[in-house]
Amino acid sequence: MSVKRFVCAAVLAACCGMAVPARAADTIETGLIGAANAVEWPMYIGLHKGFFTDAGIKPDVIYVPTAPGLVQQLAAGSLDVCDIGVVEPIHAVARGASVGILRISGAVSPYAIIAKSDIKTIKDIKGHTFVIGGLVDINRVYLERVLKAAGLKDADIDITVAGSTSARFAALKSGSADVTMLAPPVNFFAEAAGFHSIGNMIDYTKDLPFGSTDVSRAFAEKHKDAVLRFVSALDKAYAWFNNDANRDGAIDILVDEMKNSKRDDVAKSYDFLRKIGFFPTDGTISKKHVEALMDEMTAIGDTNGKVPMDTLIIAGVSKVGP
C-alpha cells in the first residue's frame, strides 16, 4: 500500500471507529552478563516502565556468562547490542571487529573490595588469591590501580578468574579466593555472610569509566532508526532511576528481577549507586576518560596503544564530549 493510500485508509478507519494496526515493535537482541544484577538496573526499568514499548522496541534479553563471550557474540552478529565493561569494545575494535559504543552506561566503578576477615587493608592482600572477572577486562585494569596504591605487584598475589559478580562471590564463599571486587547488591550479601569491605574501587579509579552499551555496526547501519529509539528509551530509564521520587519503584523492579534478593540490600544498592553517580543520565562518551582508560590498558600490556575515538563511536548516534 502506498503512503497516500495508507493515510487515507487510516483516516477512514478512524472515522468509522476502526482500530489502525499498530506498527510491530523492532526486536533487538540484547546481551547482558551473568544474571540479573544492579548494574543493569536501567534496562529493567525500561522494560518494566514501558519505555522500550513506547519507543517501538522489544529487547530480547540474553545473559552470557563472561564479558569476552558477550563481545564475541556482538562482533559475530548473534547479538545486536550489549552492555559490558568499556575495555571490551576497545579490545574488539583493536582486533578489527565491527562494533561501536552507543553510550556510557556506568560512569564510575560500582565495586566494593570484599575480603576474608584476616585481610584488613589493601596492603594485606599480599600473598592471597584475588579473583577478578577476566585477565583482559575492566576488573584487571582496576586491580592494577589497587596494587599500585598498596605498593604491590602482580607477583605479590595469585590472580584467578570468575566471569561475573555472582561467580566471584561463589569463589569467595567456597574458599578458592580470599578477596575480590563485587558490585551491589552482591557486596551486601557478602558482608551478611561474614566477609567485609576493605575499600571502594571508586577511590582508586575515579577517572576511569566502567561500562558501555555497545552495538554491532552492521546492525546500527541497517537499523539506525531502531538504534536511536533504543538509546532514547534507555536515556529515559536512566533519568527515571536518577529521580529520587522513583526510589521505591526502582527498588521494586530490581527485587522482582533478582528474585531472591532482600529488599534492604537492594535499597542499599540504590542509595550507593545514586551517591557515586554511577548511572549517567545522558551517557556522553568522554574522550578524556576513555583515553585515560586506554592509557591504563596500554601500561599493563592489555593493548598496543590507543584506538582512534572515531573507530569506537557510532556517528550520528553516540554522544561524544571532551
Regions found by a protein language model. Name each.
Residues M18-A24:
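Sec/Tat signal peptide C-region and signal peptidase I cleavage site
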Residues G127, A192, I314:
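Phosphate-coordinating loops and pocket residues in cytosolic domains that bind phosphorylated ligands
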Residues M1-V3:
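N-terminal secretory signal peptides that target proteins for export/translocation
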Residues V87-E88, S166-M258:
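Pocket-lining segment of extracytoplasmic ligand-binding domains
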Residues A24-D154, I159-A162, S166-A171, D178-P184, ...:
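Short, glycine-/small- and polar/acidic-enriched structural segments
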